Amino acid sequence: MQQQHLMQMNQNMMGGYTSPAAVTTDLIQQYLDENKQLILAILDNQNNGKAEECERHQAKLQHNLMYLAAIADSQPPQTAPLSQYPSNLMMQPGPRYMPPQSGQMMNPQSLMAARSSMMYAHPSLSPLQQQQAAHGQLGMAPGGGGGGTTSGFSILHGEASMGGGGAGAGAGNNMMNAGMFSGFGRSGSGAKEGSTSLSVDVRGGTSSGAQSGDGEYLKVGTEEEGS
């Protein structure tokens, strides 16, 4: 009963105003601006003691507020944006589904096979390293009898040396000096049996000597003197 009475009062107040169906935002903004001016006028009238004008402004303000309230009641509820979203997209409590990952994991055998293929994919020496090794030092070490002798052949910066060890503990050396320090040596079996040396001087002198097993040194030399 009371609600019907309020609706009837609203209709009576809205008799001189535009119907709610033709209301626009500009019209609502005009009412809001007018209400602001009415409030300021009411405060001014109260300060100045103008009671009649204050009551008239209050009645006008109340009328405008009732009209705006009636417009708000006549508008349909705006629930359309909420209904646009499907219900299955709403967040639901509960554990999340996790897909199985067993197919993505690798067993230890496949990991070992992949590691082996990566280790043996490249050769031990590159072609550049093989070429450097071929032009570098060439060594041959065949095993001998007795004390494990070695023989080597090396070519390095113009110097050639060849040495071989016998079955004994020590070996002598034969040196031939031709101005460029290139030596050719041979050692026989036995310990300190003998050594011979032959040297050719650049000036034309030759000398030869022999050392016997007793340690004596015999020197036989011939020198060519200019006439």
Swiss-Prot record:
Q: Which domain of life is it from?
A: Eukaryota
Expression (tissue specificity): Expressed in shoots, aerial roots, ears and tassels. Expressed in the shoot apical meristem (SAM), young leaf primordia, leaf margins, inflorescence meristem, floral meristem and spikelet meristem.
Q: Name one GO biological process term.
A: positive regulation of DNA-templated transcription
- Return the annotated region ranges for Disordered: 186-227
Q: Which family does it belong to?
A: Belongs to the SS18 family.
Query: What is the purpose of this protein?
Result: Transcription coactivator that plays a role in the regulation of meristematic function in leaves, stems and inflorescences. Regulates shoot architecture and meristem determinacy. Binds to the inflorescence architecture gene UB3 (unbranched3). Regulates the expression of several genes involved in inflorescence architecture. Component of a network formed by the microRNA396 (miRNA396), the GRFs and their interacting factors (GIFs) acting in the regulation of meristem function, at least partially through the control of cell proliferation.
Q: How does it assemble?
A: Interacts with several GRFs. Interacts with GRF10. Interacts with GRF1.
Protein name as catalogued: GRF-interacting factor 1
Q: What organism is recorded for this protein?
A: Zea mays (Maize)
Gene that this sequence comes from: GIF1
